[in-house]
């Protein structure tokens, strides 16, 4: 029975739509899918019904199944149906109808009629409440649509749909993660499973719904992939759902199940029983073709997940039958062909094993499956083992041959291992299958006797069973008995194969071989030839071949001595190539047996052995005996090549003819193959012997099919056979029939034959004569065009060693234009004619032209690939072909572009070959205008590029040929080619330049070469912006290099600078940078002399831009200035010059990019040249000379700047305008000067330091412009910064000049300042390595400048003096009076002044004193106080710098002087400054000094330190800082004092401590009379407490000095003479710590205890609440300290009780109770005896009027007392 809660829930659900009030009814009625609530509330049922009915009729028209609801849900009576008054049965029927409708409407929610029809059910029957689950389930797959969002807004969510709660009345649709959470609930999955069952049963599933279901289940599986327990719970549910889906007839349902099963098995491997059951379910209802493929994929995936033992066992018979019925064999093959991406080896292994077990009819077909699938090794082993077992019981064992041959072909060793595991050998198994199988034998091969023995054992075991009598066997196969004296070599292959199988069967059944042979072959001839054929048959087992050899030996013994058996030798010789050593060995024995017989002219079966009445030429008995004897004596069984033995050198012609005839007439394919291989392998084989095979070659191609059939039936490798046949064509072949045979084989339709002969040609071709070579080449070309070949004709052609003469002949035979292109009288090219055009339009001629183009393409591709050694005839032929291709292009409109490009490559290769062979030559027959015209007419950039390369290559071989076409070529390149952004175009331009330009320069026809060069430069530089950025350097460097760098760099630089100027004027800054980057990289391609010379020449060109230059008359006549410069105005020329100089400056100067690219760094290039010992001195001098010229030109440009003038405006105008113009001129000239000074700096920076100094000294010493000297001096300073110490001699030179400059009174402040800074920099760098005389002189001059009253010079002088003191040390002592007082005076002068240079000045002074402290500390003591003051008050100097100086002071100055000076500085300066930074630095120095001082010195300096300490204690009374700052200062002072105290002994510290006590209590030694006693006491007690914490019990006895004063002070607190809470707290803390750290019973002294205890405990009378806890601690500590003295305990108890009486004040009692509680908690056992006196007091306090006191006693003191006594306190109260 359901619980009460369930019953109530059911009642609530039933009454969910019962509305007793109007608002509730309105709310229920307004729930709508279509309308908003306000609109819905106004609608009546009739209106809703009418709208819904119309939509319902639309649904019926779409799907007739909706018609069933016409008389129920959508009947006219439904308007009046009220669900709330229906019976249970009626409600049940209504719910069923609604559910059926929702299942049917599910795929149609996207239709408007569906919404309006369902609207009726929601409004009338409230299905969103009563059928909410079905409504949600049927629309769940629509969760991303607006419909589902509307449903969520009105539906009452069932509990299982809680994940949708956040999306109710929300603008967002549920997410994919929400669906995963929903489906991850097992209860919901069960609900959804039931829903699926219903829709499957009702057959209302549809694709989108199934797809949604599948995806959801897959997501759930993926979501729980790492949760194996959850997956195990999902397995039964998913299997159940899959089973229901598979039971459906819908292919979509089945495919959904397939997908779910595959994913589930992948995530959680299922056991085999489940997979077998799933497979059975999948196959049980498989009808549709669409589902069949998916079913097979799924089954394969399921089986692929199996692991462990038995995973590839054969299928149960029932499952196999289902698989066989569902998937026919051909279907499985097709599946494997198309679906290789699936791994399905386990399923197909099980399937194959099932075929082996149940379905033997398919055994012969399983090879097809095996060929299409890759199996694991263990799977192959299982299959092989099953097949071996099957071979024991299978009647028709021939079905197994194909499959075993396949396994042996892929892994013969594995098959043999499987046989060995079953105690079988390969030979026995071959007999069992009646065929030859194994080809690869192990080194430990069994001998013939062993094989026969094993075979006999197998026979014996077979004979033990029920064997058929031989007579019955013979009767059964009597039709195959041979009674004629015939050669069995000639019988048909079918009959022989059958006889062979009978022989194998007879042997395997245990019949004697001789019995079989004598019974089935009644004549000796047929028996011998039969065993002979078996011996050389690849299809016969090895064991059978051995038996046949044994029988042959027996048969030979039965032949009369007069019969010569040499006729059998050729076949036996081929048996010597058998893979089995045993066969070869036994064959040799048979040959030895024949050799022992007499050699007569009566040959055995001489005319019938190879054919009826076929007489084969034989050797004479003498020759045959000689041959056989020598052969056997030389033959070794292990030999693999016996060709040299077959054809001995003696009488080789006789033997060659004999063996050639034998090879020709041998009817057996295997023997013929062996024989041909032996013959064609010997060197004697030549075209004379190939004549023997003329008829064979003539008929071979027509008879090829029959030979192929023979090879297949006899298991002979047909490819080996055909290779041997193709080898008949001999090296140096002259026979035309043989060449025809070769060509026919190539052109045959048989791919194998064509490819074999194509390979054969490669070795034959070099040995043939020219006509035959030409014939073969021409036939390959013709056949490649005329028909589709079975081999790659082009590849074969390109593999042949063709010569230039072959190509010339082929090209001549395939030409179109019959005109003689080499006729020199024809100076113009042949033009396209109308006749040619009209002719080529005809179809037949057009086809011929296309074929001709194909031939030409093949020829050209071959020529391009081979790169033959060329001659002039070939070049002429190629030019003729170029004309032909133009004809085909222009007249015929054929696609000749590829052929033209290939021809261009061939022309390049040909010219290159001619050049390497003959060098320069004259080619009068070559027409360059053909090339130029082809270049112009071609529309392909690649074609144009290649033809340009041809022009260039031709120029290098025959310059005269192309010189008259130079300008058109370069014009074309500038306009088109260099704009192509590809490697090939760039290579083309570079190569063309490098070939044509030298020819141009060498030509005698060019008179004014400079004009030509400048024209070329302008042509190429104009196209600069169009050249791809990354191609520019390579292209232009090639051009300049070929034109001559020394003459061309400057004009080219001028042209580029002009474009740079244009960019600047147009504000294209980024583009202008590209020019600088380019030219830096460009210059790196040339040596340094060429670069410097180029810059110098550029200056000459820039000078031509000056209006007043003497050279400017030359400018208009130069080609270089023809591009607009001549027409420029003066102002434009000035701008151009300025920008040109700016360009030079940026090219010479270093940039960030030069750091990563050293090749473009001009400075580094110069340095490497000057410092390289391998470079000649002459070259270095040339570099220096070029640099001096560059420097002089730079300085000259600077000097000339002032004389430049120009007029930007018209001369007419007002004075104001003229003034404005002059102002602009000044600005421009200033800009030009700045550029030149920057250029000068960069130029000077190029040289090494020695050369640099030599260059600038004359400038610094002379009457050079001040700004020039200023820049030079700055550059000098920077130059020396990174120079090595070895450059000090050079530094002396420059220093001498700089010192002289500082002595000149006429020098400006700017020059003096930069000079002093440079001196400082040089001295810092080289120090004492410099000349001491110069250093002293520098010091004198700096001291003079120190008094100049100019702050700039004072700073620079101080800097120089600092570096000099650092360098010279004590040697500077004589200048002390001139430095220190002056520096102090300067500091004081500017201390309170406002100046921008104040920071630098203070820093310079601080650093000056720092250097003195470091180098001459003892001499600075007289001014140490001033140094400290300056240090503390240099506010503009960084604190880190001043702290570093403090460290130097402590390190170098004697500490006694430091302490004394600190005491003075504090008293006289710092204490009165109110400078917090100064105080902080003072304390830092004091702390550093205290930490650094040793104990001995500390003892000596202790009076000084403690005087300073007392001064620091007094600081709080005079400073203006806030309380927190004062406390931090005092904390630092206490910490420093404690560190100092730790370095003193007791003897020293006691009097000092007494001194401090007297200072605090008596005011002795107080320097500040304004400081009150309370302030002193607070400072003292803080110090004492800090010291007590550090020294603990060591200074407990020191309390004697302050015992009485402290007692008095406590009494003053009681009497309120002194009221200071902070002081009282400090006193209590000091007492507490003293009691706490007492280890010497100091406070157990009665006198001290009595003195202090009363005063301390009496503090309870008026202690402030904020410090009450400190008093409690002090009393508790005193009690703890005296706990062992009963008398003292009694005294304390009495004193405490006196403050706990009822008459006492409330707070007094409260703190007394607290104190007593602490005492008992710490020393309760010692005070138990005193408890009786306390009990009445406690009893009174428990009834105290003050609740806080009463509560403290009850909850505090009583509890503590009880814990001490161990019993309740109530007993004492009663």
From Swiss-Prot:
Keyword Chaperone: no
GO molecular function: snoRNA binding
GO biological process terms held by the UniProt record: maturation of SSU-rRNA from tricistronic rRNA transcript (SSU-rRNA, 5.8S rRNA, LSU-rRNA); positive regulation of transcription by RNA polymerase I
Superkingdom of the organism of origin: Eukaryota
HEAT repeats: 1734-1772
Residues making up the signal peptide according to the UniProt record: none
PROSITE patterns, alphabetized: HEAT_REPEAT
Protein localization: Nucleus, Nucleolus
Ranges of compositional bias, category Acidic residues: 1215-1226
Gene Ontology CC, one term: small-subunit processome
Keywords carried by this UniProt record: Nucleus, Repeat, Ribonucleoprotein, Ribosome biogenesis, rRNA processing
Region (Disordered), start-end ranges: 1206-1226
Family that this chain belongs to: Belongs to the HEATR1/UTP10 family.
PANTHER family per UniProt: BAP28, HEAT REPEAT-CONTAINING PROTEIN 1
Complexes and interactors: Component of the ribosomal small subunit (SSU) processome.
Function: Involved in nucleolar processing of pre-18S ribosomal RNA. Involved in ribosome biosynthesis.
Protein known as: U3 small nucleolar RNA-associated protein 10
Organism field: Kluyveromyces lactis (strain ATCC 8585 / CBS 2359 / DSM 70799 / NBRC 1267 / NRRL Y-1140 / WM37)
């Amino acid at each position: 029975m359901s619980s009460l809660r369930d019953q109530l829930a059911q009642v609530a659900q039933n009454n969910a739509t019962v509305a007793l009030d109007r608002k509730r009814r309105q709310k229920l009625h307004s729930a709508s899918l279509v309308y908003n609530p306000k609109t819905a509330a106004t609608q009546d049922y009739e209106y809703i019904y009418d709208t819904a009915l119309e939509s319902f009729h639309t649904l019926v028209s779409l799907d007739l199944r909706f018609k069933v609801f016409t008389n129920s849900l959508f009947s006219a009576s439904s308007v009046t149906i009220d669900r709330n008054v229906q019976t249970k049965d009626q409600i049940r029927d209504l719910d069923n109808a609604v559910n059926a409708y929702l299942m049917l409407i599910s795929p149609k929610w996207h239709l408007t009629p569906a919404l309006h029809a369902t609207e009726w059910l929601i409004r009338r029957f409230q299905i969103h409440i009563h059928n909410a689950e079905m409504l949600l389930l049927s629309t769940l797959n629509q969760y991303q649509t607006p419909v589902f969002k509307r449903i969520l807004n009105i539906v009452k969510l069932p509990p299982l749909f809680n994940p949708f709660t956040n999306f109710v009345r929300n603008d967002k649709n549920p997410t994919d993660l929400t669906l995963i959470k929903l489906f991850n609930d097992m209860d919901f999955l069960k609900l959804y499973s039931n829903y699926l069952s219903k829709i499957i049963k009702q057959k209302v599933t549809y694709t989108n719904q199934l797809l949604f279901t599948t995806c959801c289940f897959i997501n759930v599986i993926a979501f729980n992939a790492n949760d194996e327990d959850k997956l195990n719970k999902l397995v039964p549910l998913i299997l159940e759902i899959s089973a229901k889906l598979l039971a459906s007839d819908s292919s979509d349902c089945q495919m959904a199940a397939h997908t779910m099963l595959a994913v589930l098995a992948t995530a959680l491997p299922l056991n085999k029983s489940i997979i077998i059951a799933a497979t059975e379910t999948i196959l049980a209802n498989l009808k549709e073709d669409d589902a069949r493929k998916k079913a097979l994929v799924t089954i394969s995936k399921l089986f692929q997940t199996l692991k462990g033992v038995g995973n590839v066992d054969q299928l149960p018979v029932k499952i196999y039958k289902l698989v066989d019925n569902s998937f026919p064999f051909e279907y499985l093959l097709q599946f494997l062909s198309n679906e290789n991406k699936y791994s399905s080896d386990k399923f197909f292994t099980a399937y194959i094993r099932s075929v082996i077990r149940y379905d033997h009819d398919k055994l012969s077909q399983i090879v097809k499956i095996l060929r299409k699938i890759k199996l694991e090794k263990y799977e192959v082993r299982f299959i092989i083992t099953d097949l071996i077992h099957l071979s024991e019981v299978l009647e028709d064992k021939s079905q197994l041959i194909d499959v075993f041959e396949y396994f042996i072909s892929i892994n013969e060793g594995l098959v043999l291992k499987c046989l060995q595991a079953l105690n079988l050998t390969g030979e026995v198994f071959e007999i069992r299958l009646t065929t030859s199988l194994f080809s690869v034998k192990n080194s430990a091969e069994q001998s013939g006797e062993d094989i026969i023995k094993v075979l006999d054992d197998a026979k014996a075991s077979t004979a033990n069973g029920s064997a058929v009598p031989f007579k019955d066997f013979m009767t059964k196969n009597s039709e195959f008995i041979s009674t004629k004296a015939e050669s069995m070599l000639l019988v048909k292959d079918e009959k022989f194969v059958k006889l062979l199988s009978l022989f194998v069967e007879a042997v395997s059944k245990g019949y004697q071989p001789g019995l079989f042979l004598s019974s089935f072959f009644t004549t000796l001839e047929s028996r011998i030839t039969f065993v002979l054929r078996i011996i050389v048959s690849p299809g016969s087992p090895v064991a059978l071949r051995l038996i046949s050899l044994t029988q042959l030996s027996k048969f030979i013994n039965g032949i009369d001595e007069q019969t010569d058996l040499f006729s059998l030798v050729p076949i036996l010789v081929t048996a010597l190539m058998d893979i089995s050593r045993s066969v070869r060995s036994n064959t040799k024995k048979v040959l030895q047996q024949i050799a022992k017989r007499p050699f007569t002219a009566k040959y055995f079966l001489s005319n019938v052995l190879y054919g009826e009445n076929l007489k084969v030429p034989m050797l004479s008995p003498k020759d045959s005996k000689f041959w056989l004897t020598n052969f056997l004596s030389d033959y070794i069984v292990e030999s693999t090549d016996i060709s040299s033995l077959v054809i001995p050198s003696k009488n080789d012609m006789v033997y060659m003819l004999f063996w050639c005839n034998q090879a020709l007439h041998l009817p057996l394919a295997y023997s013929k193959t062996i024989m041909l291989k032996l013959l064609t392998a010997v060197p004697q084989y030549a075209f004379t012997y190939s004549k023997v095979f003329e008829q064979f070659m003539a008929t071979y191609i027509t008879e090829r099919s029959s030979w192929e059939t023979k090879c297949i039936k006899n298991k002979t490798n047909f490819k080996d056979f055909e290779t041997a046949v193709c080898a008949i064509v001999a090296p140096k072949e002259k026979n035309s029939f043989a060449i025809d045979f070769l060509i026919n084989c190539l052109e045959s339709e048989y791919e194998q034959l064509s490819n074999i002969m194509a390979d054969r040609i490669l070795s034959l071709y070099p040995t043939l004569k020219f006509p035959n070579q030409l014939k073969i080449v021409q036939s390959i070309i013709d056949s490649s065009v005329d028909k589709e070949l079975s081999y790659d004709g082009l590849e074969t052609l390109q593999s042949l060693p063709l010569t230039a003469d072959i190509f010339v002949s082929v090209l001549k035979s395939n030409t179109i234009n019959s005109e003689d292109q080499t006729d020199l009288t024809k100076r113009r090219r042949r033009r396209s004619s109308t006749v040619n055009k009209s002719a080529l339009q005809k179809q037949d001629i057009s086809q011929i032209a296309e074929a001709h183009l194909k031939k030409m393409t093949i020829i050209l591709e071959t020529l391009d690939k081979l790169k033959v050694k060329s001659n002039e005839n070939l070049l002429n032929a190629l030019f003729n072909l170029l004309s032909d291709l133009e004809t085909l292009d222009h007249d015929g409109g054929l696609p000749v572009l590829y052929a033209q490009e290939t021809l261009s490559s061939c022309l390049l290769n040909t010219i290159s070959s001619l050049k390497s062979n003959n060098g320069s030559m004259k080619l009068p027959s070559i027409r360059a205008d053909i090339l130029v015209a082809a270049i112009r007419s071609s529309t392909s950039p690649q074609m144009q590029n290649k033809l340009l390369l041809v022009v260039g290559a031709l120029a290098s071989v025959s310059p005269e040929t192309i010189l008259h076409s130079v300008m058109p070529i370069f014009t074309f390149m500038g306009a088109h080619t260099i704009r192509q952004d590809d490697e090939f175009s760039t290579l083309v331009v570079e190569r063309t330049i490098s070939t044509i330009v030298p020819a141009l320069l060498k030509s005698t026809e060019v008179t004014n070469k400079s004009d030509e060069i400048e024209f070329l430069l302008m042509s190429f530089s104009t196209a600069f912006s169009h050249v791809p950025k990354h191609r520019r350097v390579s292209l232009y460097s090639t051009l300049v290099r070929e034109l001559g760098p020394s003459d061309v760099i400057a004009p080219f630089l001028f042209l580029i600078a002009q474009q740079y100027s244009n960019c600047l004027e147009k504000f294209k800054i980024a583009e202008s940078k590209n020019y600088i980057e380019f030219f830096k990289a460009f210059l790196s391609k040339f040596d340094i002399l060429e670069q410097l010379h180029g810059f110098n020449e550029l200056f000459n060109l820039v000078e031509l831009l000056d209006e007043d230059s003497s050279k400017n008359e030359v400018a208009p006549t130069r080609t270089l200035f023809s591009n607009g410069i001549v027409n420029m105005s003066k102002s434009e020329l000035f701008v151009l010059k300025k920008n040109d100089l700016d360009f030079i400056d940026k090219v010479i100067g270093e940039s960030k990019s030069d750091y990563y690219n050293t090749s473009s760094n001009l400075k580094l290039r110069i340095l490497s040249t000057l410092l390289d010992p391998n470079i000649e001195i002459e070259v270095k001098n040339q570099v220096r000379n070029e640099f001096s010229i560059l420097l002089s030109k730079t300085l000259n440009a600077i000097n000339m700047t002032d004389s430049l003038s120009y007029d930007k405006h018209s001369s007419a105008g007002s004075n104001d305008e003229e003034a404005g113009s002059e102002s602009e001129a000044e600005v421009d000239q200033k800009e030009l000067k700045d550029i030149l000074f920057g250029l000068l700096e960069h130029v000077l920076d190029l040289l090494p330091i020695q050369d640099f100094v030599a260059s600038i000294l004359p400038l610094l010493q002379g009457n050079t412009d001040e700004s020039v000297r200023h820049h030079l001096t700055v550059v000098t300073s920077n130059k020396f910064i990174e120079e090595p110490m070895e450059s000090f001699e050079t530094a002396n030179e420059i220093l001498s000049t700089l010192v002289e400059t500082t002595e000149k009174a006429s020098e400006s402040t700017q020059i003096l300042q930069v000079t002093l800074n440079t001196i400082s920099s040089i001295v810092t760098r080289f120090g004492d390595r410099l000349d001491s005389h110069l250093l002293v002189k520098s010091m004198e001059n700096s001291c003079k400048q120190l008094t100049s009253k100019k702050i700039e010079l004072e700073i620079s002088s101080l800097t120089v003096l600092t570096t000099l003191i650092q360098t010279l040390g004590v040697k500077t002592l004589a200048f002390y009076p001139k430095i220190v007082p002056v520096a102090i005076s300067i500091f004081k002068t500017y201390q309170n002044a406002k100046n921008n240079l104040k920071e630098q000045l203070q820093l310079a002074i601080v650093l000056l004193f720092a250097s003195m402290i470091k180098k001459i500390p003892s001499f600075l003591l007289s001014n140490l106080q001033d140094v400290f003051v300056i240090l503390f008050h240099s506010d503009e100097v960084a604190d880190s710098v001043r702290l570093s100086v403090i460290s130097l002071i402590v390190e170098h100055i004697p500490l006694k002087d430091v302490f004394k000076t600190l005491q003075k500085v504090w008293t006289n300066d710092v204490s009165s400054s109110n400078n917090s930074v100064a105080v902080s630095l003072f304390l830092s120095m004091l702390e550093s000094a205290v930490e650094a001082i040793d104990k001995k010195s500390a003892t000596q300096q202790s009076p000084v330190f403690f005087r300073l300490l007392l001064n620091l204690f007094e600081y709080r009374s005079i400073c203006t800082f806030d309380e927190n700052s004062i406390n931090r200062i005092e904390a630092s002072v206490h910490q420093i004092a404690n560190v100092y105290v730790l370095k003193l002994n007791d003897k020293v510290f006691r009097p000092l401590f007494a001194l401090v006590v007297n200072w605090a209590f008596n005011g002795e030694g107080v320097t500040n009379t304004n400081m009150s006693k309370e302030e002193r006491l607070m400072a003292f007690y803080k110090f004492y407490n800090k010291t007590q914490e550090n020294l603990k019990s060591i200074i407990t006895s020191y309390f004697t000095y302050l015992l009485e004063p402290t007692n008095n002070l406590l009494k003053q607190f009681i009497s309120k003479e002194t009221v200071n809470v902070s002081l009282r707290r400090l006193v209590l803390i000091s007492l507490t710590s003293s009691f706490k750290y007492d280890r010497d019973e100091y406070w157990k002294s009665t006198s001290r205890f009595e003195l202090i205890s009363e005063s301390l405990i009496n503090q309870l009378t008026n202690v402030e609440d904020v410090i009450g806890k400190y008093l409690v601690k002090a009393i508790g500590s005193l009690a703890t300290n005296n706990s062992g003295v009963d008398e003292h305990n009694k005294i304390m108890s009495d004193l405490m009780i006196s403050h706990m009486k009822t008459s006492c004040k409330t707070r007094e009692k409260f703190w007394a109770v607290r104190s007593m509680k602490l005492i008992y908690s710490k020393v309760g056992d010692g005070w138990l005896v005193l408890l009786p006196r306390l009990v009445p007091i406690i009893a009174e306090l428990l009834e105290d009027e003050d609740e806080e006191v009463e509560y403290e006693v009850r909850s505090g003191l009583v509890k503590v007392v009880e814990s001490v006594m161990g019993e309740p306190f109530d007993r004492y109260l009663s």
